[in-house]
Amino acid sequence: MARSKSSNRWLEEHFSDQYVKKSHADGYRTRASYKLLELNDKDRLIRPGMLVVDLGAAPGGWSQVAGQQVGTHGRVVASDILPMDTLEGVEFIQGDFTDDSVFNQILLAIGDTPVDLVISDMAPNMSGINAVDQPQAMYLVELALDMAKRVLKPQGNFVAKVFHGEGYDQYLKDLKGCFEKVVIRKPDASRSRSREVYVVGKGFLGCQTVS
């Protein structure tokens, strides 16, 4: 089957991308690893010994970074509907974390250890139709925040990918009602044309309505 011009253009861009080349050289699973590395450098999110929950983890670019950063005395609990190859120091739970059975597996994996950080690089399969894609993207990031509300320890932190568009401003208001500090980041590894940004919530307070 012949490829479309757009798919050929994507392939050319992908394989010439400096972060794709760098990920191969550095042994990271995806270019997305560099987004979390930069976020961590700026916001000091991950430290040795932490417990991190990674939502939408496959193929493992963020879990790989988190596992390296928390070290042998920390843990990463990762979940995705898609399968993910094993990573050292990462416990992977396959399934939809909105299902009670999967959520309970995550809680079982967490155990009695307070969760220091919830991270999410989730995004829907993009159709190119904003009226379809944006609500789906906001739904996922709202699910990630719901999970954070349920498992984060007081003063814990949260990172998630969000797309500019309908629902974005309200989401930021909701975040500001849950954390002492909220910042927006656009890592260098994010493609400039992408509407994606990363919200960083620091110092979990529980949640209250912000007008």
UniProtKB/Swiss-Prot annotation:
InterPro entries: RNA_methyltr_RlmE (IPR050082), RNA_MeTrfase_FtsJ_dom (IPR002877), rRNA-MeTfrase_E (IPR015507), SAM-dependent_MTases_sf (IPR029063). The keyword rRNA processing applies. S-adenosyl-L-methionine binds at residues 60, 62, 80, 96, 121. The keyword Transport does not apply. Its EC number is 2.1.1.166. It holds the Pfam family FtsJ. It is an enzyme of class 2 (transferase). The active site is at 161 (proton acceptor). One of its GO terms (cellular component) is cytoplasm. Its main location: cytoplasm. It comes from the Bacteria. Keywords: Cytoplasm, Methyltransferase, rRNA processing, S-adenosyl-L-methionine, Transferase. Specifically methylates the uridine in position 2552 of 23S rRNA at the 2'-O position of the ribose in the fully assembled 50S ribosomal subunit. Belongs to the class I-like SAM-binding methyltransferase superfamily. RNA methyltransferase RlmE family. NCBIfam families: PRK11188.1. This is Ribosomal RNA large subunit methyltransferase E. It comes from Cellvibrio japonicus (strain Ueda107). The lineage of its organism: Bacteria, Pseudomonadati, Pseudomonadota, Gammaproteobacteria, Cellvibrionales.
